[in-house]
Amino acid sequence: MAKKYFGTDGVRGEVGQFPITPDFVLKLGYAAGQVLVQHDTDQKPTVLIGKDTRISGYMLEAALVAGFTAAGVNVVQTGPLPTPGVAYLTRALRLSAGVMISASHNAYSDNGIKFFAEGGVKLSDEIELEIEAKIDEEMKTQPSARLGRARRISGADDRYIEFCKSTFPSHSDLRGLKLVIDTANGAGYGVAPKVFHELGAQVVSIGDEPNGYNINEKCGATYTKTLQAAVLQHEADYGIALDGDGDRLMMVDKNGKVYDGDSLIYVIAKARAREGINIGGVVGTVMTNMAMEIALKEQGVDFCRAKVGDRYVLEQLNQRSWLIGGEASGHILCMDKHNTGDGIISALQVLAALQTLNQDLATVCADWQPYPQTMINVRIQKGQKWQEASKDVLAEVEKELEGKGRVVLRASGTEPVVRVMVEARQADWARDGAERIASAIGSL
């Protein structure tokens, strides 16, 4: 059954436009609360709610709290905390569920609601459908004796900081390294610099002055120019960029070169292979560069592709019992460290890997050069038959690139666009193919 409200990563949209309105989020909290009460009959469920730094987070948090407590669910509020921190605390505190209020890398004018089940794992499709089925039902507030309570907890940041630090090798530290940390004026501003500082690094913190409106604005993992300039200015060894909710990572070396998720996954996997750690293999996506796949196999590391989206990478990792996976966008999963993507922990694993290999980022990543990719986003209207419109041109381009490249077309799960990606050994082949396919789709 198709989902009505949940996308690939929860419920997301522009604030003030359906479904990111106070009245809908109230109903969403109430519906989710009803499902929790039905599934947790032994005791009153408790939900953890975290958020990033968007101004709308206050409004949406209040609506969620009202919905959950009206359904008879207790609520624990952390304030600003990265998404992986919410997942961790949901598990560590043995709570019934966790909720993150964030639109990740989007502008402040967007927001979203992401749920975690007991244990800090993402909700199953079945539970999301159960919640959706109850959203349109009439709200019936529990009797006063059964209402939930809401409270804020102190020390959430500190618990998450200690957890992140525990994933770094106990016999080592970061002394001697100068790092620039860009937290995108987002959820990680209060925790990320402390993690690296407490492990011994000299830290320069930027993107750490959120005002409710500047999250992801010319900073963070989706805009690395600010970090690149800061690394050069401060003569730092590396720069680390998170996105607004702290689950993505990009890194910059001392020369200002940017390393995306693919490169960082390769570094981690190569070091684990060198140490003789059996990671099973690496899960990438249909967007992962072909050159990386070849380089991993040369290191004796198996590789497979999942659909785009960290939830699909996670599904493949769980099915195969593999440990490492992720996307070029900076979502990186190290399953032996955390059960969800975590920008801070991923950066620690990269730095630990570089110590293991006794090399810098540039040297390790020189093992492979990405095939040139051209990515074009084509806006579409709901119901447009873009697959039919692009069928003939797609067949032509795929035939031309056989053995020399590949094509990936996919509809975004969060916005009305089709992403056209063409990868080839030569940049002009990729650019020409992508433009032809995008033109065919755009002609609708």
Swiss-Prot record:
Coiled-coil residues: none
Protein task: Catalyzes the conversion of glucosamine-6-phosphate to glucosamine-1-phosphate.
UniProt GO MF annotations: magnesium ion binding; phosphoglucosamine mutase activity; phosphomannomutase activity
Pfam family, one: PGM_PMM_I
Cofactor notes: Binds 1 Mg(2+) ion per subunit.
Residues the record lists as binding Mg(2+): 104, 243, 245, 247
Keywords: Isomerase, Magnesium, Metal-binding, Phosphoprotein
UniProt cross-references to InterPro entries, sorted A to Z: A-D-PHexomutase_a/b/a-I, A-D-PHexomutase_a/b/a-I/II/III, A-D-PHexomutase_a/b/a-II, A-D-PHexomutase_a/b/a-III, A-D-PHexomutase_C, A-D-PHexomutase_C_sf, Alpha-D-phosphohexomutase_SF, GlmM_bact
Catalysis: reaction(s): alpha-D-glucosamine 1-phosphate = D-glucosamine 6-phosphate
Any GO BP: carbohydrate metabolic process
Keyword Metal-binding in annotation: yes
SUPFAM superfamilies, A to Z: Phosphoglucomutase, C-terminal domain, Phosphoglucomutase, first 3 domains
Active site per database record: 104
Enzyme Commission (EC) number: 5.4.2.10
Stated name of the protein: Phosphoglucosamine mutase
PTM field: Activated by phosphorylation.
Family: Belongs to the phosphohexose mutase family.
Phosphoserine: residues carrying this PTM: 104
Cellular compartments per GO CC: cytosol
Cofactor(s) essential for the protein: Mg(2+)
